[in-house]
């Protein structure tokens, strides 16, 4: 405290004799104000809720290969059987199978839907089974839950951001407004409810997404040999530091289907960390905090 007061007295004595010092301090004040405000915005954006929850969520790592006892099995068959087995595990609260649809994941697909033929919105496609919303604890319409949405690409649930984009361009837009595939005015896509606002990563804005529910028939017909992702939520009472180890040792062998093997269950918090490191999200806050600290030290020592 004495050190700070001493420096303030020195600054004041110099101010009385040199107007340039005042200008210099004013400039430093402006820069510091800008940096602190920017840092505050970054931290607020970084730590505000994402709109979904990844606590107790895991992603299966699967391997397909080796000798097969049933040559008629497709990848879709294997994944669906593994999903059914996983859903029956006592420690599992919810599970879902999806294609290119995980949050904080580099694999994405996009498409456009239109209202009144010409009002188009482009958004990320979420192709998944009904358990997806429960796995990530997203918010959907209790009157029109995602799990009850008819399967297929003729029925869609819009995320709040996608709904808002339509409404911005068409003020009368509602859940009863019929949609069509962009460029194909003869197609009809019926809306279900809405998915609450969420962001796919820390510094992203609310994500516009089209949610399509897939049943077994659709998956077997259109995703025969595609690579799928399986995620699941563990009951809080069953989760813990040893769950991953116990899962690999005890549960994973029960999920194997022919030549599909479950190699690991990765906590989704690790997926989040890897994604943020790759995108430099954590560095944005840390680097700016270092600059602010450096300037503060220089002000009091200079």
Placement of each model-derived feature along the sequence:
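Short beta-strand boundary microenvironments
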Residues: 88-178, 183-206, 214-222
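"Rare, low-scoring activations can occur
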Residues: 160-165, 184-284
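Hydrophobic alpha-helical transmembrane segments of multi-pass inner-membrane transport and secretion
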Residues: 14-40, 280-302
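Short amphipathic alpha-helices in soluble, non-transmembrane regions
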Residues: 82-86, 170-173, 243-254
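Short amphipathic alpha-helical coupling segments at ligand-binding clamshell hinges
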Residues: 74-82, 153-154, 239-247
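A short amphipathic helical element positioned immediately N-terminal to and/or at the very start
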Residues: 3-12, 82
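Membrane-proximal extracellular/periplasmic loop immediately following the first transmembrane helix
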Residues: 36-120, 125-127
